[in-house]
Amino acid sequence: MNRPYNFSAGPAAMPQEVLTEAAAEMLDWHGSGMSVMEMSHRGREFVSIYEQAHLDLRELLAVPDSFKILFMQGGGLAENAIVPLNLSARVSPAGAAGSADFVVTGGWSLKSQQEARKYCTVNIAASNESDGHTTLPGPASWQLSHGASYVHICSNETIHGVEYHTLPDLQALGSEAALVVDCSSHVASRPIDWSRVGLAFAGAQKNLGPAGLTLVVVREDLLGHALAVCPSAFNYKTVADNQSMFNTPPTYAIYIAGLVFQWLKRQGGIAAMEARNQAKAALLYDAIDNSQLYYNKVAPNCRSRMNVPFFLRDESLNDAFLAGAREHGLLQLKGHKSVGGMRASIYNAMPMEGVQALVNYLHEFQKRRS
C-alpha cells in the first residue's frame, strides 16, 4: 500500500512499521488474549511493556542514572504549569514560589511564560519577538536574574521554525538555575547533552508516538520541591516514586511509543537519525532558497530541522498549491494560523522519499506557474 506523505506538525506521521505491528497486535498482544488498551496498568503484561519502553528510551537518549524518566499526561501545554508547580520553590525559603527566567523565541515559549506567571515570578531573559521570531538570541545576550529557580527554553519552536542546535551552558553563563527544555518537536531527532539539562519534557505526538503521552526527564535533585498546591498526580517526586503509575498512565500511548523506540533502535539510534534529519532538512531548504516562488524567513543558522515554514511570494496561489499537493499525496502542508503560508514537518518518521516527493512538487508547481 502506497500511503500519502503526512507533513502534519502534530499529531504527526508514524513509522509505517509501527502502525503495521500495532495493527497485527490489536486484538491479541503476544498471546495474552487481550488488546493492550484492555490491560490493567498493574498487570504483568503491561508492566513488561512499560519496563521495556523505559529501558529502550533511556538507552536511546543516553539518559544518565541521575535522571528519572516519567511517563505523564497533559502534553507540553500542561507542563508549562507543572514545571513551575514543581520547580519554582526550589531555591525559595519555606517552600514559597520563587522566580524563573524565560527565553521567548516563538509561540510555545510565549505560552510557557504566560502560564508560569500564575505560579511564580517570571523574568524575560531574552526575546526575538521584535524580529518576528526569525532569529535566536544567543545565550551570551540573555539577561539572567539572580536566584532564579530555573531557565526555560523551547529548543525547537514548532510554529516559527527556529531551533537551538546547541543547548546553552548555564554554568558558563554564571547561573546556578536549572535548565528546563521544552523539546517536544525535536526530541529523539538529535543527541541531548544531559550535563547541561535539569529537566526536559516533550509531548509524544510529534516524534515519539501518539497524543496522550508526555515524556519528562528530570534530574533527581530537582525532585521534592513542589508547591503545596501542586496536585499529587503532577508532583514529579510522587510520579517518580510510583514508577509513573500513581494514577492510571496512558497505557496504549506508552505501548505505541515503545514500538517507536524499538523502530528507532533498528534505524541505528539517535546519531543515525540526526544525520538523516540533517540531510532531509538540507534538501528541502535548498529547494526553497533556490526557487523564485518560495521563501523562508528564518535566519539560516537557526533554522529548524523538524519544522520548515515557507511562503509563496504570490499568496493568491496558496489554495491551488495545497490542492495540488493533496493530489500528489502530500498532506497537511498548511501553515499555522498565526503565521500563515506553508509548513512541512519532517520528523523522524518522514522518509527521505517523502521530502524528495515534496521537493519534486515544489519544482513542478513553480514551473507550471512561471
Swiss-Prot record:
The keyword Oxidoreductase does not apply. Pathway: Amino-acid biosynthesis; L-serine biosynthesis; L-serine from 3-phospho-D-glycerate: step 2/3; Cofactor biosynthesis; pyridoxine 5'-phosphate biosynthesis; pyridoxine 5'-phosphate from D-erythrose 4-phosphate: step 3/5. Belongs to the class-V pyridoxal-phosphate-dependent aminotransferase family. SerC subfamily. Its EC number is 2.6.1.52. It comes from Albidiferax ferrireducens (strain ATCC BAA-621 / DSM 15236 / T118). L-glutamate binds at residue 42. GO terms for biological process: L-serine biosynthetic process; pyridoxine biosynthetic process. The modification N6-(pyridoxal phosphate)lysine is found at residue 206. The keyword Iron-sulfur does not apply. This is Phosphoserine aminotransferase. GO terms for molecular function: O-phospho-L-serine:2-oxoglutarate aminotransferase activity; pyridoxal phosphate binding. Binds 1 pyridoxal phosphate per subunit. Gene3D superfamilies: Aspartate Aminotransferase, domain 1, Type I PLP-dependent aspartate aminotransferase-like (Major domain). Catalyzes the reversible conversion of 3-phosphohydroxypyruvate to phosphoserine and of 3-hydroxy-2-oxo-4-phosphonooxybutanoate to phosphohydroxythreonine. It catalyses: O-phospho-L-serine + 2-oxoglutarate = 3-phosphooxypyruvate + L-glutamate; 4-(phosphooxy)-L-threonine + 2-oxoglutarate = (R)-3-hydroxy-2-oxo-4-phosphooxybutanoate + L-glutamate. The gene is serC. It comes from the Bacteria. One of its GO terms (cellular component) is cytoplasm.
